[in-house]
């Protein structure tokens, strides 16, 4: 995973800890109980990291996070997602 973004994490300048300007395409595939977010274009997952029973990270060959998979979502959580992005 590329950690260059966190090179200022030890700095006292709080604003330097975040990426302020970036452009990113995200495709979202939603079912009634799950969501798959694909970050960027033509990204192929080489392995999955299980973070919890319902959250997984898809990693490509360069060890970049290219997919987020959320499972066992409630209808309210899916609706909240639509409200947040709409």
Curated annotation (Swiss-Prot):
Which species does the entry assign this protein to? Escherichia coli O157:H7 (strain EC869)
> What name goes with this protein?
Immunity protein CdiI-1
Free-text function comment from the UniProt entry: Immunity protein component of a toxin-immunity protein module, which functions as a cellular contact-dependent growth inhibition (CDI) system. CDI modules allow bacteria to communicate with and inhibit the growth of closely related neighboring bacteria in a contact-dependent fashion. Neutralizes the toxic activity of cognate toxin CdiA-EC869 (the C-terminal 289 residue CT fragment). Does not inhibit toxic activity of CdiA from other toxin-immunity modules or strains of E.coli.
What interactions and quaternary structure are annotated? Answer: Interacts with the C-terminal fragment (CT) of cognate toxin protein CdiA-EC869.
Could you tell me the superkingdom of the organism this chain comes from?
Bacteria
């Amino acid at each position: 995973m590329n950690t260059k973004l966190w090179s200022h994490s030890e700095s006292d300048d709080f604003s330097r800890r975040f990426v302020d300007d970036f452009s990113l395409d995200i495709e979202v595939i939603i079912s009634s109980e799950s969501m798959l977010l694909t970050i960027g274009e033509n990204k192929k997952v080489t392995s999955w990291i299980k973070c919890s029973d319902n959250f997984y990270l898809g990693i490509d060959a360069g060890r970049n996070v290219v997919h987020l998979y959320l499972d066992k979502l409630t209808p309210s959580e899916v609706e909240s997602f639509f409200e947040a992005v709409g």
